[in-house]
A protein has these predicted regions:
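Copper-binding active sites and cupredoxin-like electron-transfer domains
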Residues: 1-202
Length: 202
Protein backbone atom coordinates (compact mmCIF):
# COMPACT_ATOMS: atom_id res chain seq x y z
CA UNK A 1 0.00 0.00 0.00
CA UNK A 2 1.27 3.54 -0.66
CA UNK A 3 2.75 5.28 2.35
CA UNK A 4 5.78 5.92 4.55
CA UNK A 5 7.35 2.94 6.27
CA UNK A 6 9.94 2.34 8.96
CA UNK A 7 12.24 -0.62 8.39
CA UNK A 8 14.30 -1.98 11.26
CA UNK A 9 16.05 -5.00 12.69
CA UNK A 10 13.38 -6.82 14.70
CA UNK A 11 15.83 -9.06 16.53
CA UNK A 12 16.73 -8.23 20.12
CA UNK A 13 13.79 -5.79 20.15
CA UNK A 14 13.73 -2.92 20.72
CA UNK A 15 17.48 -2.57 21.35
CA UNK A 16 18.82 -3.12 17.82
CA UNK A 17 16.32 -0.59 16.45
CA UNK A 18 17.15 1.98 19.12
CA UNK A 19 20.89 1.69 18.50
CA UNK A 20 20.52 2.63 14.85
CA UNK A 21 19.43 -0.41 12.84
CA UNK A 22 16.51 1.38 11.20
CA UNK A 23 15.54 3.65 8.30
CA UNK A 24 12.63 4.82 6.21
CA UNK A 25 11.24 3.98 2.79
CA UNK A 26 8.34 5.19 0.68
CA UNK A 27 5.82 3.38 -1.48
CA UNK A 28 4.34 5.76 -4.04
CA UNK A 29 0.81 5.41 -5.40
CA UNK A 30 0.78 3.71 -8.78
CA UNK A 31 1.25 6.23 -11.57
CA UNK A 32 2.04 9.16 -9.25
CA UNK A 33 5.26 10.80 -8.14
CA UNK A 34 3.77 13.77 -6.28
CA UNK A 35 1.12 12.31 -3.95
CA UNK A 36 1.29 10.35 -0.69
CA UNK A 37 -1.88 8.42 -1.52
CA UNK A 38 -4.41 8.55 -4.34
CA UNK A 39 -6.19 11.91 -4.20
CA UNK A 40 -3.86 13.45 -1.59
CA UNK A 41 -2.63 17.03 -1.87
CA UNK A 42 0.41 17.24 -4.15
CA UNK A 43 4.04 18.07 -3.36
CA UNK A 44 7.14 18.97 -5.39
CA UNK A 45 9.88 17.52 -3.17
CA UNK A 46 10.10 15.18 -0.19
CA UNK A 47 12.24 14.46 2.86
CA UNK A 48 12.43 11.75 5.48
CA UNK A 49 12.75 12.77 9.11
CA UNK A 50 13.54 9.60 11.05
CA UNK A 51 13.44 10.39 14.76
CA UNK A 52 15.32 8.48 17.45
CA UNK A 53 16.77 9.05 20.89
CA UNK A 54 19.60 7.66 22.97
CA UNK A 55 19.78 6.50 26.57
CA UNK A 56 23.56 6.24 27.20
CA UNK A 57 23.07 3.57 29.89
CA UNK A 58 21.01 1.37 27.55
CA UNK A 59 23.45 1.89 24.67
CA UNK A 60 26.38 1.00 26.92
CA UNK A 61 24.65 -2.21 28.03
CA UNK A 62 23.95 -3.22 24.41
CA UNK A 63 27.56 -2.42 23.47
CA UNK A 64 28.68 -4.81 26.22
CA UNK A 65 26.24 -7.48 24.93
CA UNK A 66 23.99 -7.14 27.96
CA UNK A 67 20.25 -6.56 28.16
CA UNK A 68 19.48 -3.10 29.58
CA UNK A 69 17.82 -3.41 32.97
CA UNK A 70 17.26 0.16 34.14
CA UNK A 71 14.45 2.54 33.29
CA UNK A 72 14.71 3.98 29.78
CA UNK A 73 15.79 7.62 30.12
CA UNK A 74 16.70 9.20 26.78
CA UNK A 75 19.17 12.07 26.98
CA UNK A 76 19.93 12.71 23.31
CA UNK A 77 17.50 13.14 20.42
CA UNK A 78 18.20 12.84 16.71
CA UNK A 79 16.69 13.34 13.27
CA UNK A 80 18.22 11.18 10.54
CA UNK A 81 20.94 10.12 12.97
CA UNK A 82 22.13 13.65 13.76
CA UNK A 83 21.44 15.96 16.68
CA UNK A 84 20.85 19.69 16.47
CA UNK A 85 23.36 22.31 17.57
CA UNK A 86 22.47 25.78 18.88
CA UNK A 87 23.99 28.65 16.88
CA UNK A 88 27.57 29.29 18.03
CA UNK A 89 27.98 25.87 19.66
CA UNK A 90 30.80 23.57 18.53
CA UNK A 91 29.67 21.77 15.39
CA UNK A 92 26.85 24.23 14.62
CA UNK A 93 26.10 24.29 10.88
CA UNK A 94 28.42 21.33 10.25
CA UNK A 95 26.29 19.05 8.03
CA UNK A 96 28.16 15.98 9.28
CA UNK A 97 26.81 16.40 12.83
CA UNK A 98 24.15 19.15 12.86
CA UNK A 99 20.74 18.05 11.56
CA UNK A 100 19.81 21.68 10.91
CA UNK A 101 22.61 21.89 8.29
CA UNK A 102 22.25 18.37 6.86
CA UNK A 103 20.88 18.55 3.29
CA UNK A 104 18.89 15.33 3.90
CA UNK A 105 17.06 17.02 6.79
CA UNK A 106 17.12 20.81 6.41
CA UNK A 107 14.09 22.03 4.48
CA UNK A 108 15.21 23.97 1.44
CA UNK A 109 12.83 25.57 -1.00
CA UNK A 110 11.26 28.65 -2.48
CA UNK A 111 7.76 30.00 -2.09
CA UNK A 112 5.32 27.40 -3.39
CA UNK A 113 7.76 24.45 -3.16
CA UNK A 114 5.30 22.22 -1.35
CA UNK A 115 7.46 19.79 0.60
CA UNK A 116 6.36 16.40 1.90
CA UNK A 117 8.01 15.40 5.18
CA UNK A 118 7.74 11.71 6.02
CA UNK A 119 8.12 11.66 9.83
CA UNK A 120 8.92 8.25 11.32
CA UNK A 121 9.82 7.47 14.93
CA UNK A 122 12.31 4.66 15.54
CA UNK A 123 12.58 5.62 19.20
CA UNK A 124 10.32 5.08 22.19
CA UNK A 125 9.68 8.73 23.14
CA UNK A 126 6.72 10.71 21.79
CA UNK A 127 7.51 13.96 19.96
CA UNK A 128 5.70 17.13 19.01
CA UNK A 129 6.98 18.07 15.55
CA UNK A 130 6.93 21.86 15.32
CA UNK A 131 8.17 24.17 12.59
CA UNK A 132 8.33 27.93 12.56
CA UNK A 133 7.28 30.15 9.68
CA UNK A 134 4.42 27.97 8.43
CA UNK A 135 1.68 25.61 9.39
CA UNK A 136 1.91 22.09 7.98
CA UNK A 137 -0.81 20.12 6.24
CA UNK A 138 -1.27 16.94 8.31
CA UNK A 139 -2.16 14.09 5.92
CA UNK A 140 -1.57 10.79 7.76
CA UNK A 141 -1.08 9.47 11.26
CA UNK A 142 0.54 6.08 11.95
CA UNK A 143 -0.04 4.94 8.37
CA UNK A 144 -3.73 5.91 8.30
CA UNK A 145 -5.09 8.62 6.03
CA UNK A 146 -6.66 11.32 8.19
CA UNK A 147 -10.37 11.97 7.53
CA UNK A 148 -9.57 15.62 6.80
CA UNK A 149 -6.35 17.51 6.07
CA UNK A 150 -5.68 19.85 8.99
CA UNK A 151 -3.29 22.78 9.03
CA UNK A 152 -1.23 22.50 12.21
CA UNK A 153 1.94 24.07 13.56
CA UNK A 154 2.49 21.11 15.93
CA UNK A 155 1.93 17.52 14.83
CA UNK A 156 2.08 14.65 17.38
CA UNK A 157 4.43 11.76 16.61
CA UNK A 158 3.83 8.60 18.62
CA UNK A 159 6.77 6.63 19.97
CA UNK A 160 7.74 3.08 19.07
CA UNK A 161 7.19 3.23 15.32
CA UNK A 162 4.79 6.17 15.04
CA UNK A 163 4.53 8.08 11.81
CA UNK A 164 3.03 11.20 10.26
CA UNK A 165 3.08 12.57 6.74
CA UNK A 166 2.89 16.36 6.50
CA UNK A 167 3.31 18.92 3.74
CA UNK A 168 5.28 22.05 4.51
CA UNK A 169 3.83 24.48 1.95
CA UNK A 170 6.49 27.22 1.87
CA UNK A 171 3.67 29.77 1.80
CA UNK A 172 4.31 33.43 2.59
CA UNK A 173 3.30 34.59 6.03
CA UNK A 174 0.05 36.52 5.34
CA UNK A 175 0.72 39.51 7.64
CA UNK A 176 4.47 39.91 6.93
CA UNK A 177 5.74 43.40 6.18
CA UNK A 178 7.15 43.93 3.73
CA UNK A 179 5.19 41.19 1.98
CA UNK A 180 7.26 38.09 1.24
CA UNK A 181 7.63 37.09 -2.39
CA UNK A 182 10.37 35.26 -4.27
CA UNK A 183 11.47 38.69 -5.58
CA UNK A 184 11.79 40.26 -2.11
CA UNK A 185 13.59 37.16 -0.80
CA UNK A 186 16.07 37.28 -3.73
CA UNK A 187 16.59 41.02 -3.15
CA UNK A 188 17.33 40.41 0.54
CA UNK A 189 19.90 37.73 -0.34
CA UNK A 190 21.50 40.01 -2.97
CA UNK A 191 21.89 42.61 -0.22
CA UNK A 192 23.64 40.05 1.99
CA UNK A 193 20.64 39.40 4.22
CA UNK A 194 20.10 35.65 4.51
CA UNK A 195 16.50 34.53 4.61
CA UNK A 196 15.57 31.11 5.91
CA UNK A 197 12.63 29.25 7.37
CA UNK A 198 13.72 28.56 10.95
CA UNK A 199 12.97 25.10 12.35
CA UNK A 200 13.49 23.35 15.62
CA UNK A 201 11.79 20.57 17.54
CA UNK A 202 10.00 20.50 20.86
Amino acid sequence: APGSYLYYDGRNAPYNRLTGLHGGFAVMPQGSSNRVYSGSPTFVQQYFWVFNECDPAWNNAVRNRQTPSGRYTPRYFTINGLSGRPPGAPGAMDPAIDSMADPRTKLDGHLGDRTLIRCLNAGLAKHSVHTHGNHMEWLTSNGQVRPAVWEKDIVPLDGNGGGADVIYPFDPVPDAWPPMTNTTLRQAENEGRHSAYPMHLH
